Regions:
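C-terminal lobe and pocket-closing loops
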Residues: 126, 211-280, 285, 308-311, ...
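Hinge/capping helix and adjacent helix->loop/strand transition within the periplasmic-binding protein
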Residues: 85-90, 106-191, 252-286
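N-terminal (or domain-start) structured segment
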Residues: 21-117, 166, 178-203, 286, ...
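Positively charged n-region of N-terminal signal peptides that target proteins for export
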Residues: 1-4
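Short hydrophobic/charged patches on amphipathic alpha-helices used for structural packing
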Residues: 80, 144-147, 193, 212
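An extracytoplasmic/periplasmic, membrane-proximal ligand-sensing/linker region
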Residues: 32-34, 176, 181, 263-326
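Ligand-binding pocket segment of bilobal, Venus flytrap-like solute-binding proteins
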Residues: 155-237
Length: 326
């Protein structure tokens, strides 16, 4: 009888070990297959570069492939909607930033950060800057030069903005501050770069890391910093706020999962990101080469950040929807 009891006990323990094989301390057996990071913008932009840089380290940390898929269009809303409507099993993750709010506040879509599970902020982009093509406009050296030109010939000069994204906010703000641009719609940062290089637009906003080579060789010229304060990298470039434009922000690249995703999965993915961001020296070096800033905010901190951004934009919702601040 004792032998029988002992055998049953051993079998029970063996079954328990087998049943829980692959589960972590949180009691979840995840991930069991590849994870798809959806970047709702074209390849080569800020969100894409940051996601791809972290993805290779997440693949090592989570021991499953972490791949990036670009689903561009409509200011990031197509890719965001795809993730929102995906299964909440932890295998589809959205990469987004402050421009998520613009689509919702402007009325382009009826969903926003509230319809996802915020996972974590994983990096901050280098300075966002306003640029001109120096070869196209050799006499424009400052932001005020550009504004004066638009006032002299209202509607002639084109400012490109991604409708429903953060660049639309800039377009509204510079017009409200007195500029007389023809604000035209465009795609994400990759498309805007090609437009300004090809002389198809006169002013655009891009991440400094995307344009540093063009700035150094004299093709593009920076006329303003979109960040809330001057940076160490661009000490001599004034911010829009300094120039009298009521606009300033940073791109905090963020992961979101579909609403209802198991909190344990959210926590495990966030913890993997935190470990890489805070302890992996090679990851930090990779980001710094791209002029990006490693940053981590946990799910609660990320939710609080996005609420504050959303509330700030909702305060000027009518102005955003009208297209011009009154």
């Amino acid at each position: 009888m004792k032998k029988l009891i002992a055998m049953v006990t051993v079998l029970a323990l063996a079954f328990s070990v087998f049943a829980n094989r692959g589960k972590d301390a949180g009691g979840i057996n995840w991930p069991k297959k590849s994870i798809n990071l959806i970047v709702p913008f074209a390849a080569g932009g800020n969100s894409d570069v940051n996601a791809r840089t972290l993805a290779k380290y997440l693949t090592q940390e989570l021991r499953q492939p972490v791949v990036v898929t670009n689903v561009a269009g409509s200011g990031g809303t197509i890719g965001a909607a795809q993730v929102k409507d995906s299964a909440n099993d932890g295998y589809t993750v959205l990469v987004h930033q402050i421009s998520m709010h613009m689509a919702q506040v402007s009325g382009m879509v009826n969903f926003g950060y509230q319809d996802f599970e915020p996972v974590c902020v994983f990096s901050r982009a280098s300075d966002e800057v306003l640029l001109i093509n120096a070869k196209q406009h050799p006499d424009w050296h400052t932001y005020q030069d550009v504004v004066n030109a638009t006032k002299n010939e209202p509607g002639k000069y084109r400012f490109t903005a991604n409708t429903g994204a953060s660049t639309q906010w800039i377009g509204i703000a510079v017009q409200a501050a007195g500029a007389k641009f023809n604000v035209v719609s465009s795609g994400g940062s990759g498309e805007r770069l090609q437009l300004i290089l090809g002389n198809h637009v006169d002013v655009t906003e891009l991440n400094y890391s995307q344009v540093i080579d063009y700035v150094k060789n004299g093709t593009l010229r920076i006329i303003a910093n979109v960040s809330t304060e001057r940076s160490d990298i661009l000490k001599d470039v004034p911010t829009l706020k300094e120039l009298g434009v009521n606009c300033g922000y940073s791109y905090d690249n963020t992961f979101f999962m579909p609403k209802g995703t198991d909190k344990a999965i959210v926590a495990k993915f966030a913890a993997a990101c935190e470990k890489i961001i805070k302890t992996n020296a090679q990851y930090k070096a990779d980001l710094e080469k791209l002029y990006q800033v490693p940053m981590y905010k946990n799910p609660a901190e990320t939710t609080a950040l996005y609420k504050s951004q959303y509330d700030a934009l909702m305060a000027i919702r009518d102005q955003i929807r009208a297209g011009v601040k009154k």
